Amino acid sequence: MEKHFDINEEGYSVRCRFFVHDSHKNERHFDHVAIVTHGFGSSKDTAGTAHFAEQLTSKYKDFAVIAFDWPCHGEDARKKLAIPECMTYLTLVTDYAKDTLGAKALYNYSTS
């Protein structure tokens, strides 16, 4: 299962893409969450991101995957790329995984 959502905190709106196995689509807490980050000029909406998420959640059905757009990438509304905002986005996504999804373990998968 896949859905899009935004994390709206601290005046930011982080565009996210969320994946879980269909057998866990009604769950709200996941012990394991993989955060997918992309390279410069890319976005959360690549085929590689979807392929990774589908492969991971089919093998490890209790995992969730979150991909997000960095500032000035994909569907993000920002017009100027600033490293401090990149760090804020990553912190907001990490906090969401821990606080909202209840992640006990976080993983990172990066593509370029």
What are these regions (language model features)?
Residues H21-W70:
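Short, surface-exposed "cap/lid" segments of acyl-processing enzymes
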Residues T46, D76-A77, S112:
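Short linear Ser/Thr-Pro motifs
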Residues L101-S112:
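Alpha/beta-hydrolase fold nucleophile elbow
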Residues K80-L101:
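Alpha/beta-hydrolase active-site loop
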Residues M1-H29:
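N-terminal cap/lid segment of alpha/beta-hydrolase-fold proteins
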Residues K3, G11-Y12, F18, A50-E54, ...:
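Polytopic alpha-helical membrane proteins, predominantly small-molecule transporters/carriers
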Residues G41, A50, P71-E85:
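Cap/lid segment of the alpha/beta-hydrolase catalytic domain
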